[in-house]
């Protein structure tokens, strides 16, 4: 009897633990997660809009929807004051992305492909209930519309569209011309393209003679006086005005960051980034241009161009991401200083609109400035960046800096910059944060936060009167769309370690343990190598190379931020220049050596290395320089440096990294080309490449696979005819993970 009672008590105690047992992460779990976008607070301070992408694995489809969540007053606690708790999808019967509130808060614009391709739609909102009362399509442009932006008075919306520059004329003529050319292309049996300059394709698509332009259209559309031309613009045929005519992209394709165009606070001026250099493929000289927004009906493209002005003509490197101050006095933007170097440090600049004077506001920071926003009173800019403290945790955090340059002070003779009247930089958060924006009252910020164990969620932080750097507030989590799924999953936190790498520098590595980790066991290793090469591993979430998913079936995952990685200062980034297989390779090997010696649970006889982009190059380099790994996975990597130069679209990158072209600096291209070390290839290798990869052409993968097969090295190639540099389609991604993990399991003996 006593034994029975004891058994019952044991069961009672253990059942809760059993019911709460978490399981390893699976690909299906990852596809069940909703992908939360940036927060968009309402002007009345009651609501936050955001988009979230749902993945239907069976249908091989990703669909964005618009959601809403209540936002309490900045003096209240958790956001439950309006009678609604948690998030609610408010546009469910069509795809809907990029929500943007109107200035009066009575409606919002969004992008949808429900009818006639990508178009701008308007949703009317009951602000008291946070409910949509109706939707209508605003644009009906054959070339599609995206990137919508409200004018401050709510009367106009700007949007972008890829159009034929030769069609520049009156709005009606331009609409008809574009529609006619698009229809001719669609109906023609001939799909040949004739090129007469470089940058004829980019990323994963051919440009087909089109340019991105910015248009403005009234929200309350009047009946056109001209007859319907059948051009496909419907009631907008005489209304949409091209503000950036000409044979240039406006905005230019981005080197990173937020929107590359913005409206002044009075709605009278547009600022956008565009590159007007003769050979775009070798230039990073994106400049900021300004143009008036309002034009009469008789204005011609030549009139618009005559009023367009380059305000950063003095900088031969990239200027991008303009953002006007709320008081209209300043334009903040990001700038680089070295022409042709896409990995030069992004600086936070401001331009005085009255005088044209420019100033670096975050000069003390030796790191990239990422997303930024103004305070409502225009006194400060909040931005995202990394410093030594954040770097140690693998994070990027939110900072603030005052806007108080002394424009009357003399310029420094060497830097050309003026002294600051006051400079005050403060850390605001600790986390991997991004997408920040202020609420109406200016005392709270909204932002997204992620970690290795959690995809993006929206946070709200009420700013205290005084910040304690040792105890920064975490804020309130507003979105909980993924909590249910994640509560069932066993994940491991990111662990950091440091070791002595190339040049005696301290180099950082990270480690992720498998679920249900047992320190007394030995575990095989997946050694991940990041791309860029100017990128970095950190405490962030990824759907394409997810360390938690790689660890889930019993592996220790190790990642090294080798020389060239971001977050450790510009000198550390620059160290990879013309040294692709030098210091980075040394760091990778020393980092793995350190991990093997430090962590007794690592089985150094069962290690595989995996990498994509530059990581793929590193794998190809490893093939010819060490046989320590049981297997390798090379995804979209450079194999032949000369052919990679001739087939990439962004030629400035190779020109900078290898200090010239193959015909001006052949020694560098030969020295760092993996294909010239093929006689040493021995390690079993899985090659992966996409047909639509124009950054590193698919021929690089074919050359590698051909070489491996000719040498008799065990190898396979996974070829995606419908993917580019990244594998994005859900079922393709499923196949990618299954093939990669299966290959590694095969050679490490995991069953």
Per-segment meaning from a language model:
Residues 1-16, 72-88, 127-130, 223-238, ...:
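Intrinsic disorder/low-complexity segments
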Residues 40, 158-160, 187, 191-196, ...:
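Non-catalytic accessory segments flanking enzyme active sites
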Residues 43-44, 103-104, 152-153, 265-266, ...:
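Residue-level detector of Asp-centered blade-edge/turn motifs that repeat once per structural unit
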Residues 45-48, 108, 157, 270, ...:
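Hydrophobic beta-strand positions that form the internal "hydrophobic ladder"
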Residues 52-65, 89-97, 109-121, 129, ...:
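A flexible loop/linker signature enriched in serine peptidases of the S9 family
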Residues 521-531:
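Short beta-strand element of the alpha/beta-hydrolase
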Residues 528, 546, 551-552, 559-751:
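Active-site-proximal cap/loop segments of hydrolase catalytic domains
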């Amino acid at each position: 009897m006593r034994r029975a009672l004891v058994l019952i008590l044991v069961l009672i105690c253990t059942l809760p633990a059993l019911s709460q047992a978490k399981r390893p992460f699976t690909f299906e779990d990852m596809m069940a997660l909703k992908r939360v976008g940036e927060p968009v607070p309402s002007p009345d301070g009651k609501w936050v809009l955001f988009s979230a992408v749902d993945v239907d694995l069976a249908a091989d489809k990703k669909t964005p929807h618009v959601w809403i969540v209540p936002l309490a007053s900045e003096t209240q606690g958790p956001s439950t004051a309006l009678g609604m708790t948690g998030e609610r999808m408010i546009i469910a019967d069509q795809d809907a992305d990029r929500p943007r509130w109107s200035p009066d808060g009575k409606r919002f614009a969004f992008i949808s492909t429900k009818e006639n391709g990508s178009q701008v739609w308007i949703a009317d909102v009951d602000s008291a209930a946070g409910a949509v009362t109706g939707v209508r399509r605003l644009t009906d442009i054959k070339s599609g519309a995206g990137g919508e932006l409200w004018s401050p008075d709510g009367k106009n919306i700007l949007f972008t569209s890829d159009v034929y520059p030769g069609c520049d004329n009156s709005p009606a003529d331009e609409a008809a011309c574009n529609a006619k050319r698009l229809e001719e292309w669609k109906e023609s049996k001939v799909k040949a393209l004739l090129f007469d300059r470089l940058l004829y394709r980019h990323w994963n698509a051919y440009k087909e003679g089109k340019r991105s332009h910015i248009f403005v259209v009234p929200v309350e559309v009047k009946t056109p006086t001209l007859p319907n031309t059948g051009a496909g613009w419907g009631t907008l045929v005489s209304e949409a005005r091209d503000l950036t005519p000409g044979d240039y992209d406006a905005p230019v394709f981005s080197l990173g960051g937020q929107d590359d165009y913005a409206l002044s606070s009075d709605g009278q001026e547009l600022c956008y980034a565009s590159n007007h250099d003769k050979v775009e493929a070798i230039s990073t000289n994106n400049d900021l241009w300004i143009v008036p927004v309002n034009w009469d009906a008789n204005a011609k493209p030549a009139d618009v161009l005559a009023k367009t002005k380059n305000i950063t003509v003095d900088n031969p490197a990239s200027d991008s991401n303009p953002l006007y101050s709320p008081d209209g006095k300043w334009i903040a933007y990001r700038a680089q200083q070295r022409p042709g170097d896409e990995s030069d440090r992004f600086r936070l600049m401001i331009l005085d609109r009255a005088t044209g004077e420019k100033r670096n506001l975050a000069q003390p920071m030796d790191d990239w400035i990422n997303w930024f926003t103004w305070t409502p009173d225009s006194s400060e800019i909040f931005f995202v960046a990394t410093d030594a403290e954040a770097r140690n945790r693998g994070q990027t955090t939110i900072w603030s800096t005052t806007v108080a340059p002394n424009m009357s002070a003399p310029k420094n003779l060497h830097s050309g910059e003026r002294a600051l009247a006051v400079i005050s930089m403060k850390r605001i958060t600790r986390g991997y944060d991004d997408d920040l924006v202020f609420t109406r009252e200016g005392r709270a910020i909204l932002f997204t936060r992620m970690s290795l164990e959690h995809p993006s969620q929206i946070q709200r932080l009420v700013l205290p009167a005084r910040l304690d750097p040792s105890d920064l507030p975490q804020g309130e989590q507003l979105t909980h769309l993924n909590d249910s799924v994640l509560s069932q999953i066993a994940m491991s936190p990111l662990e950091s370690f440091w070791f002595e790498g190339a040049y005696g520098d301290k180099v950082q590595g990270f480690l992720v343990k498998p679920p249900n980790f047992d320190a007394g066991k030995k575990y095989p290793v997946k050694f991940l190598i990041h791309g860029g090469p100017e990128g970095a591993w950190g405490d962030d979430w990824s759907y394409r190379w997810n360390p938690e998913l790689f660890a889930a079936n019993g592996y220790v995952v190790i990642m090294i931020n080798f020389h060239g990685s971001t977050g450790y200062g510009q000198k550390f980034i620059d160290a990879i220049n013309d040294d692709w297989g030098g210091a980075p390779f040394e760091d990778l090997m020393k980092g793995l050596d350190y991990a093997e010696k430090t962590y007794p649970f690592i089985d150094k006889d069962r290690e595989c290395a995996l990498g994509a982009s530059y990581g793929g190059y590193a794998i190809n380099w490893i093939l010819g320089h060490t046989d320590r790994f049981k297997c390798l996975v090379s995804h979209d990597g450079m194999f032949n440096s000369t052919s990679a130069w001739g087939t990439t679209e962004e030629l400035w990158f190779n020109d900078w990294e290898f200090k010239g072209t193959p015909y001006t600096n052949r020694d560098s291209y030969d020295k760092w080309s993996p294909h010239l070390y093929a006689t040493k290839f021995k390690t079993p290798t899985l090659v992966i490449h996409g047909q639509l990869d124009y950054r590193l052409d698919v021929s690089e993968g074919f050359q590698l696979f051909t070489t491996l097969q000719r040498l008799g090295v065990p190898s396979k190639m996974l070829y995606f005819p419908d993917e580019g540099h990244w594998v994005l389609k859900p079922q393709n991604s499923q196949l990618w993970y299954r093939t990669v993990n299966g290959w590694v399991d095969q050679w490490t003996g995991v069953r």
